Design a protein with these regions (language model features):
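N-terminal Rossmann-like FAD-binding beta1-loop-alpha1 element of flavoenzymes
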Residues: 4-31
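FAD-binding beta-loop-beta segment adjacent to the flavin cofactor pocket
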Residues: 330-335, 387-422
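Active-site-proximal substrate-binding core of FAD-dependent oxidoreductases
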Residues: 441-489
Length: 518
């Protein structure tokens, strides 16, 4: 019996999952990777003797497929049940938010959140209203933004809208007026149902703790990993793929081909013959991606009262958040370091053409408004602008333009977080879910009927229960809305926010990104 063969293009998380699932079932697999390591955006690089990630990654409880990998390779995650907000000039005072794991956590949020209690009630109700919408509205929800969905609602105050705008941008690099309401509904539904632990992180960097153990698995399964293999062409003949062309002029052939590269790479191969064989793939050109930059600061001195969990800089123009990985990771020499702050800038587009040194100075200038850090306190720094490796963003109407794992070309498959999957967000769980679906489709198409890969879908609360909860709290929401309306109408200084936040709000409402290409 002939052993089936597969060429997997792209050694990111999706490509690794596809390669493993096929190799487990006896396939001969070649994995092509352009760089000198696997992992893609979920990996780390050594720069100046230190490991630097694409950006800090989180592992929520609603990552069942990613957490299955973590459990398989024997890694114990570090769990958090809260996160924090800092306001300019307020350190070390912080606003702590507990994950919505129960009534006590919700009560804490209402009376200890960033906004007064009545705005917090309205914000909670806005989330409840969104996640309780029926699945039959899926098509409508994908064609309206999250902010567009709630703006016309009777319960929406200006502060609630602004809070939602900032949270979305920092979490996904997507402006709230661009984020598909369908994506927002799904992610919120998953998080509300599985809120404990709210967030988890690895006890070390992604490459060493998460990716390298999977690389060893692939090697033990006989997967042939070819580093430094830059693909430049998908060779077609009579409507099927016949080879993958490399930059050095060589061509490689197999029975099936799985393209597991990022969207900005995959769509460069949509030439005449490939497009003609499956015109729907051309819709990938309508999909968008934005950079989410990472800045690492190693400090010379200790900062008192620095939280161990994630911290969001409220009102930050560059949408900054961070975590002190120094207290959770070990250095390359095996010792725990001092403060090593891992920042993410979700609004980095204004700095796209600024030099690394200049961008670092501008980011540090804003960071110093929130933390007592001066340039003299920084022992070393690394900046990953990530403009060459942007994140796919779930804009309005994107779902219909996203490809499925199986193309209409009988031996070509796709995997990656931009491919249609149940998670519907650019994240590790989305990439793994799409990869498992692609692997299952490949095996099914080649006669496999048993032990196919199974995609675990995060649980959600029953809609009937959500609707009931929404109805029961309407009287409280009505009272909160009246108070918020009176405040907005008669309070010129809007006491729901600090003066700093009032000044920051216009900046948050600005769109500093270049016009989108249509």
């Amino acid at each position: 019996m002939t052993i089936p063969s597969a060429l997997v293009v792209g050694g990111g998380l999706a490509g690794m999952v596809v390669a493993r699932e096929l190799a487990l079932r006896g396939w001969r697999v070649i994995l092509l990777e352009r760089s000198r390591r696997l992992g893609g955006k979920a990996g780390s690089d050594i720069k100046n003797g230190r490991l630097v990630e694409h950006g800090y990654h989180v592992f929520p409880q609603w990552y069942p497929n990613v957490r299955a990998i973590v459990e398989r390779i024997g890694v114990q995650l570090i769990d958090f049940d809260r996160y924090h907000f800092l306001l300019p000039g307020g350190y070390p005072r912080k606003v702590t938010v507990l994950g919505p794991s129960g009534l006590s956590a919700m009560w804490h949020y209402v009376f200890n959140g960033l906004l007064p209690w009545y705005h917090n009630i309205l914000y909670i109700y806005s989330v409840l209203d969104m996640i309780s919408r029926p699945l039959s509205e899926k098509r409508f929800l994908d064609r309206v933004s999250q902010i567009g969905l709630i703006r016309g609602k009777w319960y929406t105050s200006e502060s609630v809208a602004e809070m939602g705008q900032e949270n979305v941008l920092k979490a996904s690099a997507i402006p709230v007026y661009d984020l598909s309401a369908m994506t927002a509904k799904r992610i919120a539904s998953y998080w509300v149902r599985q809120a404990s632990p709210f967030l988890s992180i690895l006890p070390g960097d992604l490459q060493t703790v998460f990716i390298d153990p999977q690389v060893r698995e692939l090697e033990e399964l006989g997967v042939e990993i070819r580093y430094g293999s830059e693909v430049c062409d998908v060779v077609m003949h009579e409507g099927v793929v016949t080879a993958i062309g490399l930059r050095d002029g060589t061509e490689l052939s197999a029975d099936i081909y799985a393209l597991c590269t990022p969207i900005e790479v995959t769509r460069t191969w949509l030439h005449d013959h490939l497009y003609k064989a499956d015109p729907e793939l051309g819709n990938m050109h309508f999909l968008e991606a934005q950079p989410m930059a990472a800045l690492y600061l190693r400090l010379r001195r200790e900062l008192p009262d620095l939280p161990r969990e994630h911290v969001f800089l409220h009102g930050s123009y560059y949408a900054l958040s961070f975590i002190d990985v120094g207290r959770h990771w070990k250095r390359l020499d095996g010792e725990h370091g001092g403060h090593q702050l891992s920042f993410i800038s979700s609004n980095y587009s204004p700095l796209n053409e600024v030099s690394k040194e200049g961008a670092k100075d501008l980011l540090l200038e804003e960071i110093s408004e929130y933390l007592p850090i001066t340039p003299a306190d920084v022992e070393s720094w690394e900046l990953n602008p990530n403009t060459d490796v942007p994140l796919f963003i779930n804009t309005i109407g994107a779902w219909s333009n996203r490809p499925r794992p199986k193309t209409t070309i009988k031996n070509l498959y796709l995997a990656g977080d931009y491919v249609k999957n149940a998670i519907d967000l650019a994240c590790m769980e989305g990439a793994v879910s799409a990869a498992l679906e692609a692997a299952a489709q490949i095996l099914s198409d080649h006669g496999e009927t048993e032990s196919l890969p199974v995609v675990q879908i995060p649980a959600e609360w029953p809609r009937a229960l959500l609707v009931l909860a929404r109805i029961l709290i309407v009287p409280f929401v009505a009272v909160a809305r009246v108070i918020a309306w009176l405040e907005e109408k008669f309070s010129p200084h809007r006491p729901d926010a600090s003066e700093v936040r009032i000044k920051a709000t216009p900046r948050l409402q600005m769109d500093s990104r270049p016009p989108r290409k249509r």
